[in-house]
Amino acid sequence: LGTTRATMPYNDTVNFSSNILGCTSRFPILRKEVICRYQMNGAVVFYLLLNDNDTLRLINCHLQSMGLTAEDREQYHDIVVNPEEKRGGVEKHSRLLVSKISRASVIRAAQADSVAAYIGRNAGKSIIVCGDFNDTPISYTHHRIHSAGLTDAYAATATGLGRSFNRDAIIVRIDHMFCSSHWKP
């Protein structure tokens, strides 16, 4: 912790109920601005002074969670691994899972629209967007941020599926990083 403070002495946070979005940096944090907020989730932009005339807009996101409980994930795992054994409950549990995922997707779409609108208002500026999007690379959320003119750092530099969530037979990449043309991934 002491080494981190010595190399990155600047820190700021925004509290979203029980979640905190923050930025720890070696560059001064000029200010912060909440882009969107919904219950415990949202997006915050931190303005970092890189040098005398260059400001980075660092957008940290923790977008709406699916809201799946440990029991939901266990039922999903059972459906995937043993669909024949769960035949009677598959339809009921599938409907419940789809309902939760649908509700969360609607909220995330609005959050993604807010982040994309911010990016659009700041076109031509130095921007990095990162965080827990709780959505996959084929989602509306990912597409909306990417189509705002940013580069998907993983797609530009990595190979393979990529995964940032791996639990109960759910293996996906839901954490993402995007950058403006000022940055090379």
Placement of each model-derived feature along the sequence:
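N-terminal short leaders/motifs
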Residues: 1-3, 134-135
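Structured beta-strand-rich core segments of catalytic domains in phosphoester-bond hydrolases
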Residues: 2-78, 177, 184
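Short hydrophobic/aromatic-rich motifs at helix boundaries and adjacent loops
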Residues: 16-17, 84-89, 113-114
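Soluble or luminal CAZymes and related metallo-dependent hydrolases
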Residues: 38-40, 103-114
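Metal-dependent phosphoester-hydrolase catalytic domains
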Residues: 47, 109, 114-128, 133-185
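A solvent-exposed, charged loop/short amphipathic helix patch at secondary-structure junctions
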Residues: 73-100
